[in-house]
């Protein structure tokens, strides 16, 4: 059966349900333990294969040159890999549009998710036949978070984020909010007060403890908007930072409870409600076509 041409592909958000910094390598990279879960919410990519080798991003993202955008870089990386390995699909280019809902610098993995969706979608649409492992290895060249999106299952990550173990945390509802600022990851990881000596623990131990993000204290100290947002959310539910920020999230057992709090939110709060899912919307879309 020939793969069906799918034009619309999800690029879901992720949350770091916890994030512990356990050390730092000599090359400066931080060692961590984190738990990734996807949201049933994110950007949408519309992809139309081309008969030539042009990669066209038809909806430029403000502040990002097209050739530097992870969407274009992912497509070109896949092209180059196919050429090197004498894989010559009949269709080898693409016109790509993005409907952008996830904030840049928000800690929701938007850019990494976009890259992963391009790798997975074009592998399918071009009929390249590459394995998930190969796509994940390509994704790692684009960013440490790309492989988890390629693999499409919630995961416990260790090392510098490259060692992934599938996990099945509870699928709760989340109120995710953006404080209106963008936080550059190096700003957090470069702070001398960042905790870098959290003990290494196994996943079972971590799942039975209160979830913490070691980056949160630094984000709250440096950005009053993050402090204000977390302080408000914590009045209603457990809440914390995702990634290095700037987005924060509060967890609820039901959609109704999450929406009740969002309905009470002050005007300055910009947020949405979404469900945590252990199988990503991208994986569900792909599985429905094979």
Curated annotation (Swiss-Prot):
The keyword Nucleotide-binding applies. GO terms for biological process: isopentenyl diphosphate biosynthetic process, methylerythritol 4-phosphate pathway; terpenoid biosynthetic process. The gene is ispE. Homodimer. GO terms for molecular function: 4-(cytidine 5'-diphospho)-2-C-methyl-D-erythritol kinase activity; ATP binding. Its EC number is 2.7.1.148. It catalyses: 4-CDP-2-C-methyl-D-erythritol + ATP = 4-CDP-2-C-methyl-D-erythritol 2-phosphate + ADP + H(+). SUPFAM superfamilies: GHMP Kinase, C-terminal domain, Ribosomal protein S5 domain 2-like. InterPro entries: GHMP_kinase_C_dom (IPR013750), GHMP_kinase_C_sf (IPR036554), GHMP_kinase_N_dom (IPR006204), IspE (IPR004424), Ribosomal_Su5_D2-typ_SF (IPR020568), Ribsml_uS5_D2-typ_fold_subgr (IPR014721). The active site is at residues 14, 145. It comes from Pectobacterium carotovorum subsp. carotovorum (strain PC1). Pathway: Isoprenoid biosynthesis; isopentenyl diphosphate biosynthesis via DXP pathway; isopentenyl diphosphate from 1-deoxy-D-xylulose 5-phosphate: step 3/6. Pfam families: GHMP_kinases_C, GHMP_kinases_N. Keywords: ATP-binding, Isoprene biosynthesis, Kinase, Nucleotide-binding, Transferase. It comes from the Bacteria. ATP binds at residues 103-113. Belongs to the GHMP kinase family. IspE subfamily. This is 4-diphosphocytidyl-2-C-methyl-D-erythritol kinase. Catalyzes the phosphorylation of the position 2 hydroxy group of 4-diphosphocytidyl-2C-methyl-D-erythritol.
């Amino acid at each position: 059966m020939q793969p069906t041409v799918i034009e619309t592909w999800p690029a879901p958000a992720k949350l770091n349900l916890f994030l512990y910094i356990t050390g730092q390598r000599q090359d400066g990279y931080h060692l961590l333990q984190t738990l990734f879960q996807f949201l049933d919410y994110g950007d949408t990519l519309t992809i139309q294969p081309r008969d030539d080798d042009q990669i066209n991003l038809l909806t430029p993202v403000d502040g990002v040159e097209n050739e530097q955008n992870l969407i274009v870089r992912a497509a070109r990386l896949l092209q180059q890999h196919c050429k090197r390995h004498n894989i010559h699909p009949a269709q080898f280019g693409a016109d790509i549009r993005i409907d952008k809902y996830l904030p840049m610098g928000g800690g929701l993995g938007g850019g990494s998710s976009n890259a992963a969706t391009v790798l997975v979608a074009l592998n399918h649409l071009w009929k390249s036949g590459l394995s998930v492992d190969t796509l994940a290895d390509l994704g790692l060249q684009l960013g440490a978070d790309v492989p988890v999106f390629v693999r499409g299952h919630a995961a416990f990550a260790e090392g510098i984020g490259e060692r992934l173990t599938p996990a099945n945390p509870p699928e709760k509802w989340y109120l995710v909010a953006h404080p209106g600022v963008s936080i550059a990851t190096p700003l957090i990881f470069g702070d001398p007060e960042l905790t870098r000596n959290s003990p290494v623990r196994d996943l079972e131990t971590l799942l039975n403890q209160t979830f913490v993000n070691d980056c949160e204290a630094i984000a709250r100290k440096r950005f009053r908007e993050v402090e204000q947002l977390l302080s408000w959310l914590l009045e209603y539910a457990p809440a914390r930072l995702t990634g290095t920020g700037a987005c924060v999230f509060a967890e609820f057992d039901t959609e109704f409870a999450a929406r009740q709090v969002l309905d009470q939110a002050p005007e300055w709060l910009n947020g949405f409600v979404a469900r945590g899912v252990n199988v990503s919307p991208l994986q569900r879309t792909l599985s429905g076509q094979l």
